[in-house]
Structure formats: C-alpha cells, structure tokens
Amino acid sequence: MNYNNFENSKGDGHSRLPKPTYSGTLSDGYDESKIKRQKTDSAFNAAYSPHMYPNSPYYEGSWNTGYTPQLHHVAPHNQYFHPIQPSTQYNYTSPPNYTENYIPPVHQNISYAPALNLQKWPSSYCENTQALKNDKDYQTSISYEDVAIPTVKEIQLIEKNRGKDTFMNEISPVPSSKDQASAEPTEIPRKDPELANSNAEDDHNNLGLEDDDRDEQLESEGLGKVVLVPGTSIALITDEDVKKWREERKKMWLLKISNNKQKHMQEMGIKEDELKSQPSIFKESRKEKQFIQSIQNQVQRGNPKIDLNLKLIQREFANENSQLLDFIRELGDVGLLEYELSQQEKDVLFGSSEDNNKNHYKPNYKNRKPNLSRANFTRNK
C-alpha cells in the first residue's frame, strides 16, 4: 500500500501512518471513533411492504448518533398470510393535539386545573376557642381511679410460749386517687444521706441483737440450733446430739480410716465382725435412693401393648396351676406329703455338690503349654 498520500497535518513533510480502526479496515483519513456500534435491527424486508399493514407502527432502529428516533411502519412476524384483525371492543379517542400513537406533543404548554384557595383563619380564632375538659371530653374505656390494689405483707412472729411459729398477715390496701386527692398534701422533709445511713446501720444492729436474744432464749430452754448433716437426713437438735455425733465420727475414723486400725480396735475392745455388722448410713441412704428410683422407673416406663394371644395362654396356665395346687393341698391334708427325701433322691432331683462344682469350672485358656503353641511346631517330623 502506498502511504505517500497521507500527509501530516503539521506540514513537516513526513508521511502519516494510518490509525487502527474499530472495524478492522484501514480508513482514508476518516475518523471512525464516532461509529462504535453497528445497526442493531435487521434490514428491512421488502416482502412485507408497510402499506399493507398500516396499523402496526414501530420505531425504526437508528444509528447511535444521538438523534431522536423516527417512526417507521415495520410488519412484525408473518402477517402476510394472517393479517391482524382490527380491534372493535375498545376504541379510544385521542385528543386532537395527540399523534397517532397517543404521544403528546413535545413543544406545548399543558394547562393544569387551578389549586383550591383555602380560606386562612385569623390567629384570634385559635385564641378564642374553648379549652377541652379532660373529665368529660376524653375518658378511657376503663377507669382505674377507683381501683385499689391491696398489698399483703407477711410478718413472721415467733411465739416462745409453746415453741411454735405463727404467721400473721397484715393487709394494707393502697388508697384510691379520690382519697389521695381529698387528703391534704403534706410536705415530705428531705433526709440527709448521713442520717439515713446511720438509721440503716442502727436497724441492722437491732436485728442482729434480736437474733442473738432469740438464740440465747432457745439455748436456755434447751433447744439449740438445728444442725443438718450434709448428705444425710440426720438432724442434730440438742447439744447432746452434737456431742454424740462427734464421738461417733471420731470413733469410726479411728476404726476404719486410720492407719492404726488394729491398735485402736484393741484399745476399744471392738472386733472386726462388729464393725462389719454395723450398717453404714451412707450405704443405707444409697439403697433407699436406688429403691425409690427403681419404683419411679417402673411407674414411668410405658406399658407394652396388650397381646390377646399371650393373655389366653396365661389364663390357661393359671387354671392348670390352680388345679395342681388343689391336688397338692388334698395330699397334704391326708398326710401323704410327710416324707423325708434321702440323699440319693435329693441328688437325683436337685443335683449334688460335685455336679454344681463341675458346672462352675472354667478352663484356663491363657496358661497353655509352650509346646502347644504354633511357633514350636516343626514342619518335618
């Protein structure tokens, strides 16, 4: 290609090389940067002429040049064989200034309806209006003014004549709003924080003194504080019970936990059989707990479904057992059951002691002879 025709715009005599274009073809100096996108719609098909279908207006695809689109009649899908029937159900009438597609004119001032002129009220109207009465105009559906909510204060008073506790309830209802309104307002004096703290400390000290006085009175009457042993249901009330409990615990510690058990047993003159025969409180409580838990599990366990076949079999067994028991009772009444079995008969019926030992015998498979192991066998013998 000859590049001599391309002169430089600066006029320095040098040739100008062509610039790359978006379309991929060399240009003759025309700037194609404006044309960035080709035509989107397909070319117009001459088989479907626009004068045959005047009722189908569409916008024509335009170049990306920034101009407004032009109206052009383009036939949609194959309407040559199936033309569109004119619609007769809805006939809209367009205003005279509107176009065929009901598009309003561009350069035209559209007049709107004037806004309503609201009358302005003078400021004196708001000032002269009557004030609303809260008692008559606005009322709630339920009046809570006459409702009195009582509060119950339970004060525990201890009567020391019989050693029983009695509870006395003092009910102090809250006065209603009418009573509060009728009562004369009283001025509540302000309390100093120092005086309030001192009063609180005095009240606390007084309570402590009252508790000490009660304990002293109970001790004088022979009733000490109830001491509960943790982990058991043992309650120690008097001082004698506490002393006995301490002595018993000390004794059991020396006889069971101490390293010199034999020495303490000889000093106290107690034998091992006596210690074993003494029931342990913790073991007994554990047994009771397990027994109660087993009963609860039986109660809470779901009952199985009733099987009629099983019930019939059980009823037959019960009838047969009743007949056998009646027969055995008759034999006992006659005196035919007063017979002592010999040792041979007992062995035949119930088995001998040797047979029982044989059943309990378990061979020791671990202590095998070393010659019987597979490693000691020789292949060629």
From Swiss-Prot:
The modification N-acetylmethionine is found at residue 1. GO terms for biological process: box C/D snoRNP assembly; ribosomal large subunit assembly. Residues 1-38, 164-216, 350-381 are annotated as: Disordered. The modification Phosphoserine is found at residue 172. It is found in: Nucleus. The keyword Cell cycle does not apply. GO terms for cellular component: nucleoplasm. Residues 359-371 have a biased composition (Basic residues). Keywords: Acetylation, Nucleus, Phosphoprotein, Ribosome biogenesis. The keyword Phosphoprotein applies. It comes from the Eukaryota. Involved in a late nucleoplasmic step of 60S ribosomal subunit assembly. Present with 259 molecules/cell in log phase SD medium. This is Ribosome assembly 1 protein. It comes from Saccharomyces cerevisiae (strain ATCC 204508 / S288c) (Baker's yeast). The gene is RSA1.
